[in-house]
């Protein structure tokens, strides 16, 4: 079975740090924050095998560009699949206006 390199953008890393900080500092739940961070990180690393298992996003032009969405608890991991690598673009809270936030990242 083919294995892909998983590359995480600076924006996605920043998203994960902000998720951790919000839960740990605003909600005062550092253990929960670490658990959430670890679940997201593990899910991202799992994209090294069968990254096509997650659906393409429904909005255009993101769908045509091959952007996929993986749900992890209340968060969405957005990524593309290349020939040998998976590129994680963003990790966003799923209840937010995802299309608007994705388009701002360009």
Language model region names:
Residues 7, 39, 53, 68, ...:
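Basic side chains
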Residues 1-63:
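Basic, Lys/Arg-enriched alpha-helical interface segments
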Residues 38-49, 66-73, 96-97, 105:
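Alpha-helix boundary/capping detector
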Residues 50, 54-85:
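Basic/aromatic recognition patch in beta-strand/loop cores that engages polyanionic ligands
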Residues 27, 72-76, 80-106:
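Enriched for short, Lys/Arg-rich terminal
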């Amino acid at each position: 079975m083919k294995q892909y390199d998983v590359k995480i953008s600076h924006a996605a890393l920043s998203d994960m740090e902000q998720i951790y900080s919000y839960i740990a500092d605003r909600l005062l739940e550092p253990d929960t924050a670490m658990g959430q961070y670890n679940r997201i990180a593990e899910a991202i690393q799992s994209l090294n095998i069968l990254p096509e298992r997650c659906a393409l996003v429904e909005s255009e032009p993101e769908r045509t560009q091959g952007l996929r969405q993986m749900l992890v608890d209340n968060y969405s991991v957005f990524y593309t699949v290349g020939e040998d690598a998976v590129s994680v673009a963003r990790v966003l809270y799923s209840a937010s206006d995802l299309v608007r936030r994705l388009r701002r990242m360009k």
